[in-house]
């Protein structure tokens, strides 16, 4: 609890985690306060360790406080509290027997159940997407050539206009800067600070927060400022974001877009020029999009938004403005508002 004192907006509370009534009332109060004040809480529940820390090492080999921890077993404490409040011992025993029978019955069902089919390992990696065909005007008459960074910006602007659940957040994407590449310029002014906002310099939070945002019906578009910075967020991407659909048997995919400016450009040096696609490609459960021109950027951004799965949008910095010799072909006329380019279909530009 002392740890949170350095964070002004976070409150801390310590409770006896082995005391059911104290824990219940404390958590009830915390939830009520959180909903009213919209602030985070850290609850430190002090609990005994009644079993081994790991199955590989017996606790009596490395602990001399076993008896003290056994005295803090929450179940006997709860039984005493119930008896002191007037609940008869016979009623408590009846509940215990019923719970034991329920657990025993479920255990027997598990023992008698057939072994899982290994082929199921490959099911529910992704939720089906409604976007399967290219639609709309890719090259509408009168459309001016537009650089890739602007097509990304315009795509998100249109998405936010059409979808009130769409949010955009990350490092420096808010009002004052609008992204270090101006990839979010004007969006906070148009849609407000409650939909376009800055985050702490914390990639684990930026990526991990998409799980909760998606669960409550928002569609987060988040940005990791440079591909080089994605590593602190990789744990959240790998263990939570990419696996939610599989672990829920297809019920709860994390619907989000993670924008990642990538690659060498200008004077980025070794800490702002990395290419991380080979690492990301080995994470099952995420879709990776890597546009090579501005028209694809807009069409793929629209498809990524309507895809119910997590999509990592790799945006090469060298193609953002096409200032490097040889990248001029990345500039295309801006596609129409209704243009959408499905994910998962390669564009063959050269065949040997």
Identify the residue ranges that each predicted region occupies.
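Alpha-helical structural motif
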Residues: 26, 74, 91, 95, ...
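Flexible, glycine/charged-enriched surface loops at secondary-structure junctions
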Residues: 38-42, 89-93, 114-122, 166, ...
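Glycine-rich ThDP/TPP pyrophosphate-binding loop and its adjacent helix/strand module
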Residues: 1-105, 109-112, 281-352
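Amphipathic, soluble alpha/beta structural segments
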Residues: 104-130
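Thiamine diphosphate
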Residues: 3, 122-332
